[in-house]
Amino acid sequence: MSEPNLNPAYTLDQAIANLQQTEDASARYYAAWWIGRFRAAQPETIAALLVALEDETDRSPDGGYPLRRNAAKALGKLGDRQVVPALIKALECEDYYVRESAAQALEGLGDARAMAPLMAKLTGGLAAAQLVEGKPHLAQPYEAIIEALGTLQAVESIGLIEPFLEHFSPKVQYAAARALFQLTGDNRYGDLLITALGGTDLQLRRSAMMDLGATGYLPGAQAIAKAFAENSLKLIALRDLWATHRQRQASSESKALSPASRQILELMDSLL
């Protein structure tokens, strides 16, 4: 879904007022997006977004909840963990895309309370992870759920995630490889993503590249730089790879760039 066009004259006061009113659904939708886009974390915005997360008035033709989706996305960007229980509740929404946005938001907030509810969504394994009849999506937003568990370092979920390496959706496979590398440090999962970069489908190469960047798996740097994809996306993936590597180094006494960090930066320079 594309982002709304940005109105440069829009203000925080307008966003709060538009989100709090209930007459104009499109104004509320834009306000929720704007608050998340600019990370306008204020008590008033958080309170209004929590109300929007349970909105019943803005319904799409297929029965979805567009405002709830934007509210969940915004709450994940504001960094206030008091909203975690509300986002966990949103994992039970009938709208697949609200559940997906809630899982992504919980990943962004990094709160361990989300681990068990997210793991519960993997119950049933591959047998349950099928397409919903008449819909373009699976029973659950497995990519978002698995990626969140990896980011949250939910080591208890390893056994639940492993079967998804065999899922029929390559993107779910990549999410599983990404999370399992984050949870185990086993290089074979990083190597699976490197192999995926050699695929014939551009969209899948892009997905594998972003997942590889999120792992911080250093052997993936050269593979990302050489992948057949847009340089702009390669730069994002390499930036994420570098940031993850540096975060792991943060506990070391040396503040100097490691040889691996220098190599990643040189690869980024070569793509500019």
Swiss-Prot record:
Family: Belongs to the CpcE/RpcE/PecE family.
Enzyme category, top tier: lyase
Organism field: Synechocystis sp. (strain ATCC 27184 / PCC 6803 / Kazusa)
GO CC entries: phycobilisome
The EC number(s) this enzyme carries: 4.-.-.-
Assembly, per entry: CpcE and CpcF associate to form a lyase.
GO molecular function term, any single one: oxidoreductase activity
Protein name, UniProt field: Phycocyanobilin lyase subunit alpha
Keywords attached to this entry: Antenna complex, Lyase, Phycobilisome
